[in-house]
Amino acid sequence: MINPTRARRMRYRLAAMAGMPEGKLILLNGGSSAGKTSLALAFQDLAAECWMHIGIDLFWFALPPEQLDLARVRPEYYTWDSAVEADGLEWFTVHPGPILDLAMHSRYRAIRAYLDNGMNVIADDVIWTREWLVDALRVFEGCRVWMVGVHVSDEEGARRELERGDRHPGWNRGSARAAHADAEYDFELDTTATPVHELARELHESYQACPYPMAFNRLRKRFLS
C-alpha cells in the first residue's frame, strides 16, 4: 500500500519538475474576534514570500447590506438564533441558507484560482458548518493546506466583541464552537494575551517547520472516505 504522505510529496515534486506553479494555502479557522485578520496581516508583512490575504469578511461584506442586518435578513441568506444555555452564557448561532452556502463555495473556488496560478493565500475563516468544511476539503484537493486553529479566551473574546460594537452578544462564543467542532489542525495559536507580531512570528516558524501539512489529509479520511 502506498504511503499517502510519500505519494503527496511525490505529487508536489513532480509539479515542481514540470514547472507548474504551486500556490500554498494557510487557513486560519476560529471564532469571530479571535484575532485572525490581524494575524494574517502581520504574517503577510513578516513573510519573505508574497501571500495574498483573502478573508471571509471580503465575501461576507459583499452580500447586500440589508442581509447583514439581523433584523432584516431573509432566510435564503441565513437565519440565526441566540440562547442562554445551561452555563449561563449567551450563545449566538448562524444557520446558513442556500445563498450564503453558495457564496462560501464561490469563495473557496476563488481561492483555488489563486493557488492554481501559483499565488500563496492566507485566509481567515469561520467554518460554520460541517458542509463548509467538506466543501473546502473537496475544492482544495491536491493543494498544500496548513490548517491553523486560532483561539481566544471567552472573556477576551467577549470584550473584543463589545469593543467592536457591531456583534450580537455571544457571537464569538457561538462561532468558535461551530468553527472548531469538526476541525483538526497542523498547529494552533491562542491570541488572548500574546502580541500579534509575536503570534505572526510563531505562525511563520511553524509553517516553515512543517513543509508537508497533514491535517487536511486526516480530515479527508474522516469525511470523504
UniProtKB/Swiss-Prot annotation:
Q: Can the keyword Acetylation be found in this entry's annotation?
A: no
Q: Which CDD domains has this protein been placed in?
A: CPT (cd00227)
Enzyme Commission (EC) number: 2.7.1.-
Q: Which UniProt keywords apply?
A: ATP-binding, Nucleotide-binding, Transferase
Q: Say yes or no: keyword Nucleotide-binding present.
A: yes
Which family does the record claim for this protein?
To S.violaceus chloramphenicol 3-O phosphotransferase.
Q: What is this protein called?
A: Putative O-phosphotransferase Mb2669
**Biological source species:** Mycobacterium bovis (strain ATCC BAA-935 / AF2122/97)
Upper classification of the source organism reads:
Bacteria, Bacillati, Actinomycetota, Actinomycetes, Mycobacteriales
